[in-house]
Amino acid sequence: LATSSAASDVYKRQMWLIGVAKEDVTLMGQLLGIKLAASEFIGYIQLSDLKDATNLIHLNYQKSIIIATYMLCGFANFASIGIQIGGIGALEPKQRKNLSKFGFKALIGGTLASLLSATIAGMIIG
């Protein structure tokens, strides 16, 4: 819980930039932090709880739910760096150093791609 709270503080500004309503930026920031630290699967489990309006803590807008769905869709998390180094490195062991060098950049690129898709979906919804 402390990790998701810290992630919320870090990522809530980015959530505002991609078009999330101010009432939902904190929860959306938590979702992005969970996705990056754990995996998109855990993020989707959390999103399923946040979709339920009968819960005390929930997302207030349907647009936020749709943006979250696109934002969580992707393989950009810290575990994926290891998976890519192990998987691709097994095919070409000489390139493991390059893979580890570019792993974090790939994480940032993948996250930005997911956020761009979420932003476009939010723009289309209006």
Predicted regions and their residues:
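Short coil/turn linker and secondary-structure boundary residues
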Residues: 2, 20-21, 94
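Transmembrane helix-loop boundary segments of multi-pass membrane transporters
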Residues: 5, 26-30, 68, 101
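Hydrophobic alpha-helical transmembrane segments of multi-pass integral membrane proteins
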Residues: 12-49
